[in-house]
């Protein structure tokens, strides 16, 4: 079997956010955990390249891109209430987009699955502004690169971050080439991602949202995927799959309110792999703010992507599916059965 790879560069630490919760210590914790694990240490590291501004421009307004560059060159400042831009953040944001594009090149060649450990995260960034710690939308830019440069016709984007990926959804809302599926806590930031948000025009039916209450455990997430997301993805038959991997659904996360353990991330990744068996799965770091939980959960994702064992996390909250979850799944099925056999 071809080898998998991790995309990482120490320069991702140079997006300097000070004592902000989205800080360089996130990638430090992940990479330290990777070095501690004998099998993870063997996975090849791909060095990313900076995306060209016109590659970012496939998904973002050129004036917005230029405004980020100017702010960084002026020494930095706040792009919005949540998102800080340091003097190096423009260059690092290009490197984050380039890292996921690098992953596309790799899986379209001879690499079997990729984990992109990049920052800043991306799934909230929209056409003309930063949002929610995100400057450029890494996954959306890379998906457009795959479509425009690699003749890919069907891209699946799975987003399990505790927050809805409003930016990614908006990028492909009228595009039937991209199937976007998301679980997210609701009510919660950014307030988008309702059941009835299904796409428009040619993209109608290619956006699948399942807003969930707080407190969903591993079994609840597995049920969502087994009952809704995987049957739809199997019918879509993706040629390339991205995961917006936000590990803030872990029970220890200080922002989210979910009850997943690190075991959930391995199980969810296994399910995603099942619909892209040719090895063209790219997991891209989004959220996750408890450093220990983030590191263990990302290692669990890598264990699934690269087929090595990881230690199961003991817990006592992950048996059973609540009626709150099953009721919401049935509501989503009622909406989506107009477009898919469910």
Label for each model-derived stretch:
Residues 38-41, 63, 150:
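Short glycine-centered helix-capping/turn motifs at secondary-structure transition points
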